Amino acid sequence: MIFDQQIIQGDRPENKQCIIYFSCDPQYWAEYGQYLARSTLYYNGKQSHVHVHMIYEEGQEHSMKHLIKNASITYTFERHPKDFYDQFQLNKEHPVFARGPEICGTKNDYDLKRKIYLSSARFMLMNKLFDHYQHVLQIDADGICRNTFAIHDFKRITRQPCAMRKPKDPSVYIASCISPGIGSAGSEFKTELANKMIDAFKKPIYWFIDQHVL
């Protein structure tokens, strides 16, 4: 498999302490991600940093003319060959598999594999993108920032590994919003999460696999 051996290009958010992190492809960037980035920069650009990991398919170029140029935002990216998603197998026997086509709006195996990967790739990379001292909040790209947050609250929330609880079922943690934490605990969490996510993708996959790994 090659998905865990990719060369990550672009700029890591070096020397940035408080970071909002998300990942998306160009279409999701145009529809959602850019608004999350713009709103975060508008309300919190002076005290935080935005890092975006872009996922491109063959023939798509990483061009700043389609992105936001700002000192408070950095980008890394990966680009896939045409047959990239052929390396994955779908677990059609898993009890929750049927929810995937419903949520993703497709019954096409290729498209489903792609959407599952797009939703999970961000977790495979945190140990490569961020240093042990960086406070990171990883969120879904379709969110939006509505106000200015106090930096001491941001650091308090992101000091330890933590995840958002599912609003309708607080006993369940969801992957929509997590912090890996800082220090040795944060480093261990990022590495363990990346390794377990990579291991999961070496087996048949399904929608919700990221939440189950978490």
Predicted ranges, named:
Residues 114-172:
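GT-A fold catalytic core of metal-dependent nucleotide-sugar glycosyltransferases
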Residues 34, 38, 120, 124, ...:
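A structural signal for well-ordered alpha-helical segments within the folded catalytic domains
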Residues 22-33, 115-119, 203-207:
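Aromatic-acidic/polar surface patches that form glycan- and anion
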Residues 1-104, 131-132:
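N-terminal anchoring/stem segment of glycosyltransferases
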Residues 147-151, 175, 191-196:
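A short secondary-structure junction signal
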Residues 169-190:
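Substrate-binding rim/cap in mid-to-C-terminal beta-strand-loop elements of soluble/periplasmic
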Residues 184-214:
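Catalytic core and acceptor-binding pocket of nucleotide-sugar-dependent glycosyltransferases
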